[in-house]
From Swiss-Prot:
NDH-1 shuttles electrons from NADH, via FMN and iron-sulfur (Fe-S) centers, to quinones in the respiratory chain. The immediate electron acceptor for the enzyme in this species is believed to be a menaquinone. Couples the redox reaction to proton translocation (for every two electrons transferred, four hydrogen ions are translocated across the cytoplasmic membrane), and thus conserves the redox energy in a proton gradient. [4Fe-4S] cluster binds at residues 52-53, 118, 148. GO terms for biological process: aerobic respiration; electron transport coupled proton transport. Its cofactor is [4Fe-4S] cluster. PANTHER family: NADH DEHYDROGENASE (PTHR11995), NADH DEHYDROGENASE [UBIQUINONE] IRON-SULFUR PROTEIN 7, MITOCHONDRIAL (PTHR11995:SF14). Binds 1 [4Fe-4S] cluster. It is a peripheral membrane protein. This is NADH-quinone oxidoreductase subunit B. Keywords: 4Fe-4S, Cell inner membrane, Cell membrane, Iron, Iron-sulfur, Membrane, Metal-binding, NAD, Quinone, Translocase, Transport. It comes from Azobacteroides pseudotrichonymphae genomovar. CFP2. Belongs to the complex I 20 kDa subunit family. It is found in: Cell inner membrane. NDH-1 is composed of 14 different subunits. Subunits NuoB, C, D, E, F, and G constitute the peripheral sector of the complex. The keyword Transferase does not apply.
């Protein structure tokens, strides 16, 4: 494959179909695993903190818990550079459009971790008229970390769960080639 062909996504998709049709699905699966390994070990987080869970989140950067050992050390101030947003605290109706815009500005693939009972279900403020009953009403959530506030150990466990989720995702869109003779795999299925 010539270098200039890498600029065109359609050419790459056709090349993948050709590889898949010729039985090179093992190579694609291994490349998928390699890319997912790299993505899961170099996640750039963005913190959207509105209350006390954000204060507890700061413990992760200290020496005792040190979330840099999991590859999460490069925190970002811009959603355009972040892979995951940690939503910590109560979200009121006035903050909902801000959170939605922040999520929309993130590049794909993007992940969301709801941190604490306020972000998950409204927490102790759930009976208030201005509180949203969980951020999953606004944006899709990948990992929920309960607690008021959750301990740093629970936050690290949630980060590990998200890394596991990233490792099993398909980076390449594999074509549906169930019509090819001798191909027993369905779309998205791996050997």
């Amino acid at each position: 494959m010539k270098t200039e062909d890498f600029r065109d996504n359609e050419y790459l998709e056709e090349y993948l179909k050709e590889l898949w049709g010729n039985g090179a699905n093992i190579a694609i699966a291994k490349l998928n695993d390699l890319i997912n390994w790299g993505r899961s070990n170099s996640v750039w987080p963005l913190t959207f903190a509105t209350s006390c869970c954000g204060i507890e989140f700061m413990c992760l950067g200290a020496a005792r818990y040190d979330f840099a050992r999991f590859g999460w050390e490069v925190t970002r101030n811009s959603p355009r550079q972040a892979d995951v947003v940690f939503c910590c605290g109560t979200i009121v109706h006035k903050m909902a459009p801000v959170l939605k815009r922040l999520y929309d500005q993130m590049s794909e693939p993007k992940y969301v971790i709801a941190l604490g009972s306020c972000a998950i279900s409204g927490g102790p403020f759930k009976s208030s008229y201005h509180t949203i009953m969980g951020i999953d009403k606004i944006i899709p959530v990948d990992v929920y970390i309960p607690g008021c506030p959750p301990r740093p150990d629970a936050m690290i466990y949630g980060m590990i769960q998200l890394a596991r989720k990233i490792k099993v995702q398909n980076f390449f869109k594999l074509p549906n080639l169930s019509h090819i003779e001798g191909n027993s795999l369905k779309k998205g299925e791996r050997q």
